Amino acid sequence: MRIINLIVVHCSATRGDCTLSPEDLDRLHRRRGFNGTGYHYYIRKDGTVHLTRPIDRIGAHVRGFNAHSIGICYEGGLDCRGRPADTRTPAQWSSLWQLVNLLLEKFPACRVCGHRDLSPDRNGNGEIEPEEWIKACPCFEVKDEFGTSAT
């Protein structure tokens, strides 16, 4: 089993009025040259959690951090106009919370962060600020919900 020390939360960057099945997600990732879905888990709007990549297989979800991380993606992340927004349904919120806590029981040394929290600290102040984000993903403050961060 590989060493896991990071859980990274993502959004699929799909509009709130659209759906993206696990099969659609897999197809999108294959078109980008990956050998399947890069995330380990995918959470649908109804809260269903799909295992999309075995945990023992290195993910393809955040360059430079894949070897020792688990990627979780929720369906959504954009409002109906295509702007970044926390579009999680109550069912997604609950499923994400349960999944992260289950993974923290299995990997207690893990830190939990959002994809954007792994952006480079361009001004060197020790904090990743909105103007430094490479992308807005997952469109909510992961550290506020899970109390840990990548720093």
What are these regions (language model features)?
Residues 72:
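Ligand-binding face of N-terminal immunoglobulin V-set domains in extracellular IgSF glycoproteins
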Residues 56-63, 101:
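Short amphipathic alpha-helices and their capping/turn segments at secondary-structure boundaries
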